[in-house]
């Protein structure tokens, strides 16, 4: 199983889409606060449809709570400041795929907890700011699942 880690997500429909994605791929979702919304937000529920009960979602008040409860989870940070193409990562079961908030990405201190070799980037236009969070999570998660043979999904 892979873990999706959202650091301070801000937009409920993105998180709802990611809940649905995690439910359908058996990935565990970790929400690291403070969140930009409450989990019962109608927009989040609409985007996640009825998949919330199928998803394994864990919530943490802050980054230190997440790292304290998951001290051995290897992390891969997805960032426009990453230098490693995402498809060159060597994903393993139990890895965490870390994504920052929609408006600003991962802060330096959080990104700095991942060695440069574990900072991944999706290809995109150089004059563009970023890709949509839920799309980036889907691309990264499915690459990890592909590398692991889509175990338990067929």
Range-by-range predicted roles:
Residues 1-154:
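Post-transcriptional modification and biogenesis factors for structured RNAs
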């Amino acid at each position: 199983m892979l873990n999706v880690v959202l650091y301070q997500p801000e937009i409920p429909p993105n998180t709802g889409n990611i809940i649905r994605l995690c439910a359908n791929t058996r990935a565990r979702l970790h929400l690291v606060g403070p969140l930009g919304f409450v989990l019962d937000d109608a927009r989040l529920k609409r985007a996640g449809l009825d998949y919330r009960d199928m998803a394994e979602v864990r919530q943490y008040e802050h980054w230190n709570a997440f790292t304290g409860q998951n001290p051995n989870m290897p992390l891969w940070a997805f960032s426009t400041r990453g230098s490693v193409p995402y498809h060159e990562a060597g994903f393993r079961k139990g890895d965490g795929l870390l994504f920052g908030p929609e408006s600003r990405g991962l802060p330096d201190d959080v990104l700095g907890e991942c060695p440069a070799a574990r900072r991944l980037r999706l290809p995109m236009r150089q004059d563009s700011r970023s890709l949509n969070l839920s799309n980036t999570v889907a691309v990264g998660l499915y690459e990890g699942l592909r590398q692991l043979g889509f175990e338990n999904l067929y």
